[in-house]
């Protein structure tokens, strides 16, 4: 008899207009108002990892004999809907729109400031 495994239903993927290296501001949660750089995007989970935001402590066991265990502080992921792209020049967070240039290339533009990102 097969054992039952608990698998969560697949989440519906949202269009993330965030890339690695973008500066974002947290708009909800305990770290609301903090800004940081996107270290990694997890598009299948609709999550991002932001530098210096949503820090978690983890206890690591020693791997070799004679080595001591340690406590590691690292960033945990945030849902992509809880962050907004941040303009460092104008110091304001804004939604993003996709525009098509005359040559056919697609760029991202901040709606509040009109600043083109890519």
UniProtKB/Swiss-Prot annotation:
Listed GO CC annotations: ribonucleoprotein complex; ribosome
Entry GO MF terms: rRNA binding; structural constituent of ribosome
SMART domains (UniProt xref): KOW
InterPro entries according to UniProt: KOW (IPR005824), Rib_uL2_dom2 (IPR014722), Ribosomal_uL24 (IPR003256), Ribosomal_uL24_CS (IPR005825), Ribosomal_uL24_KOW (IPR041988), Translation_prot_SH3-like_sf (IPR008991)
Record keywords: Ribonucleoprotein, Ribosomal protein, RNA-binding, rRNA-binding
A biological process term (GO) from this entry: translation
Residues that span the membrane, as ranges: none
Subunit structure: Part of the 50S ribosomal subunit.
Family statement drawn from the similarity comment of this UniProt entry: Belongs to the universal ribosomal protein uL24 family.
Protein name: Large ribosomal subunit protein uL24
Gene that produces this protein: rplX
